[in-house]
Amino acid sequence: MAEKEVRLDKWLWAARFYKTRSIAKAMIESGKVHYNNQRAKVSKIVEVGAMLKLRQGNEEKEIKIIALSDQRRGAPEAQLLYQETESSVKKREEIAWARKNNSLSMPHPDRRPNKKERRDLLKFKHQDKFE
């Protein structure tokens, strides 16, 4: 028995990477989705065992297609359609850790500046413009 054919945009929607098929289509067309290390078209028929690279915001995921589905199900069932590679998980964790540590090193004020402090800040920022 032959497996059913599923389009790339429909599979991404069914696997819950994108909320709508039109968003999935837009991401594929803009080059944020690569199928087996090549830019893909929306109507590409996906195969079990293929590798996908997805860019979502600051994150880049590498996933392997394990199963096919053209119906959107709950999140636990959708996660059974793919498996993220170990290197991808590790890379995303390192980036998240670096982003977290970077934000911790920046000083954050305890409170908002009052009126006098705001004026002083504005003077300081614009002091070269008036000289």
Swiss-Prot record:
CDD domains: S4
SMART domains: S4 (SM00363)
Ranges of biased composition (kind: Basic and acidic residues): 108-131
All residue ranges annotated as the S4 RNA-binding domain in the record: 6-67
A Gene Ontology BP annotation from the UniProt entry: cellular response to heat
GO MF annotation terms: DNA binding; ribosomal large subunit binding; single-stranded RNA binding
One Pfam family here: S4
Function: Involved in the recycling of free 50S ribosomal subunits that still carry a nascent chain. Binds RNA more specifically than DNA. Binds with very high affinity to the free 50S ribosomal subunit. Does not bind it when it is part of the 70S ribosome.
Family membership noted in the UniProt record: Belongs to the HSP15 family.
Protein name: Heat shock protein 15 homolog
